[in-house]
């Protein structure tokens, strides 16, 4: 696939120098991600495309361009391409997201709108598509493949089969199938998943993968099934095995999970890094504003010892190859003119950002205009929760008094989203299971989608909170109302706060509502601009810390993967506790 110029014949003339180019960037050190070289060059741009790169005699033909941009000796690198991103996880609309990431040098993102798809179905994906039109960046869309993530083990607000995939495939800027996270369905050749893959193969679009800890013959089967990328690679051995087997590894640095160091440790001894890319996956507004976006991920890789040019190539050229766009991600004739001027290859703070040859950001500030628009979905209520009482949050035991053995989920590490199954012997009082210490909490996953009234209850150990109730409708991927709590009374108050505002996050301690982060769009997204949202997010983080989450860099997102039944080994859903690898529900009592 190629991004086509609007007038190829005119571009040819600009390349030959027989007509003026729109712009030339001169006095730069060009970072050539194809050869690995750095050298002085002039880059001529015509109609959003690179027409000519002059490196033999830079400075000689500047008169052949209408505008001359002095790079002041800076490095000129391609615009960054995020290999895998859920814009909803920034809690911003696509337009506000663009305002946040463009000054950081991100000119293209491959976005998977499966968060909003799980809540609003086709209407949600169309919203993400329509609201990202006409932006000074490229938001390319992968069609959500697993809505819900694992059918039969959770209830979402929609279900995508081949019919829905086919309908979305005709949208402009759709380039592939989003992360095929039901990896067992691929490995086992299940009809629902394979029908979707077969359809996308016929369309000639790429298949994005999701294969945590998948290894050996299971990995071979997954690759033979079609998906060829993975952003869920979490350790060094896994990274090396996947790249050796021809898989693209999208090393992730999100607000939740950071895997770049482990991935690089695994592959630093190989000769070719062509199958290594970078992604942010889930990065919230506060981090984007104060830390950065993909430029921060590349900085991290360099700090772990990766060669800067190789790291930049992984964030540009390699990613374009992964998504099958031939003329994106490098600075060469016929390529799209997405470029950054940076003072340092280690710091990667763009002095200027060009998108399609147009200056869109300068010195950390957006200079392109992004018009504010409103859409009907932004006013739609998605909280269809039945009337709740304290009784809904009590775990009723099979005995009135005594003890019972409970199947529970356990976190071994505050920094990891993976969990283990454990069996706890807990006391029973008045027919209800009691907690014995502050490492234990109750969990409720309350279905919030129209037509359901299911509530999954369980026990979690090592979640990190020591008191109170933490509630969120940001709860991958079905985004049901998930609550971790110490008492049913606190849980009810936290739930009511979110039902009242249309969704978001809330924290309650000793019956007092500490803070509510309102996310009225699908219970996932704020309508506030990035700076306002970041301030609100900081208040929510402080509320989380007041409940005991003090040892996490970003406590806001601790809860969001607790109900994601594709991350091993056990997770909760509105139907109960799920054995991820066996794809079956686990009884509450052992």
Model-inferred region functions:
Residues 2-15, 19, 98-206, 269, ...:
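Divalent-metal coordination cores built from histidine and acidic residues
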Residues 55, 113-116, 144-146, 182, ...:
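Short, ordered loop/turn segments at secondary-structure junctions
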Residues 1-41, 45-46, 102-104, 289-305, ...:
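Active-site microenvironment of metallo-dependent hydrolases
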Residues 77-84, 111-114, 142, 178, ...:
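Active-site neighborhood of phospho(di)ester-bond hydrolases with catalytic His/Asp-centered motifs
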Residues 124, 159-179, 185-251, 257-279, ...:
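Histidine/acidic residue-rich metal-binding segments in metalloenzymes
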Residues 28, 48, 73, 84, ...:
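Divalent metal-coordination and catalytic microenvironments
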Residues 22-24, 66-67, 107-109, 137-140, ...:
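Structural motif
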């Amino acid at each position: 696939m190629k991004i086509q110029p609007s007038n190829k014949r005119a571009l040819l003339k600009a390349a030959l120098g027989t007509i003026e180019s729109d712009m030339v960037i001169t006095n730069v050190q060009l970072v050539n991600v194809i050869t690995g070289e750095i050298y002085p060059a002039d880059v001529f741009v015509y109609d959003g495309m690179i027409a000519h790169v002059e490196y033999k005699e830079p400075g000689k033909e500047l008169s052949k361009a209408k505008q001359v941009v002095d790079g002041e000796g800076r490095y000129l690198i391609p615009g960054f391409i995020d290999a895998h991103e859920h814009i909803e996880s920034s809690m911003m609309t696509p337009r506000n997201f663009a305002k946040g990431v463009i000054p950081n040098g991100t000119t293209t993102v491959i976005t998977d709108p499966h968060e909003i798809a799980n809540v609003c179905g086709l209407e949600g994906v169309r919203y993400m598509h329509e609201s990202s039109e006409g932006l000074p960046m490229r938001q390319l869309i992968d069609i959500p493949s697993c809505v819900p993530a694992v059918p039969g083990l959770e209830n979402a607000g929609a279900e995508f089969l081949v019919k829905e995939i086919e309908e979305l495939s005709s949208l402009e800027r759709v380039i592939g199938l989003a992360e095929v996270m039901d990896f067992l369905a691929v490995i086992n050749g299940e009809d629902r998943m394979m029908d979707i893959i077969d359809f996308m193969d016929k369309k000639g679009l790429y298949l994005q993968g999701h294969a945590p800890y998948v290894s050996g013959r299971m990995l071979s089967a997954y690759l033979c099934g079609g998906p060829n990328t993975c952003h869920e690679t979490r350790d060094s051995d896994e990274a090396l095995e996947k790249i050796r087997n021809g898989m693209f590894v999208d090393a992730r640095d999100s607000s939740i999970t950071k895997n770049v160091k482990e991935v690089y440790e695994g592959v630093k001894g190989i000769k070719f890094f062509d199958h290594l890319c970078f992604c942010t996956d889930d990065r919230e507004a506060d981090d984007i504003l104060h830390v950065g976006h993909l430029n921060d991920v590349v900085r991290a890789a360099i700090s772990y010892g990766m060669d800067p040019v190789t790291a930049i190539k992984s964030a540009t050229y390699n990613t374009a190859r992964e998504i099958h766009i031939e003329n994106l991600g490098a600075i060469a004739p016929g390529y799209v003119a997405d470029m950054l001027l940076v003072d340092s290859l280690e710091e990667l703070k763009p002095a200027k950002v060009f998108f399609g040859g147009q200056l869109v950001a300068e010195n950390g500030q957006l200079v392109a205009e992004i018009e504010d628009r409103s859409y009907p979905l932004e006013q739609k209520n998605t909280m269809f929760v039945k009337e709740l009482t304290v009784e809904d949050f009590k775990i009723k035991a099979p005995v009135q008094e005594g003890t019972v053995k409970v199947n529970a989920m356990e976190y071994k590490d505050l920094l990891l989203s993976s969990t283990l199954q454990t069996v706890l012997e807990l006391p029973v009082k008045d027919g209800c299971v009691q907690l014995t210490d502050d490492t234990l909490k109750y969990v409720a996953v309350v279905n919030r989608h129209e037509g359901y009234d299911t509530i999954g209850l369980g026990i979690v150990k090592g979640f990190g909170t020591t008191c109170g109730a933490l509630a969120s409708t940001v709860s991958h991927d079905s985004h049901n109302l998930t609550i971790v709590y110490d008492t049913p009374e606190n849980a009810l108050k936290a739930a009511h706060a979110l039902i009242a505002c249309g969704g978001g996050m809330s924290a309650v301690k000793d019956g007092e509502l500490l803070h509510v982060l309102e996310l009225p769009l699908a219970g996932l997204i704020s309508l506030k601009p990035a700076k306002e949202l970041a301030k609100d997010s900081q208040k929510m983080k402080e509320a989380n810390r007041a409940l005991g989450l003090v040892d996490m860099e970003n406590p806001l997102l601790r809860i969001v993967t607790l109900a994601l039944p594709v991350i091993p080994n056990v997770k909760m859903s509105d139907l109960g506790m799920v054995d991820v690898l066996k794809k079956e529900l686990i009884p509450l009592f052992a």
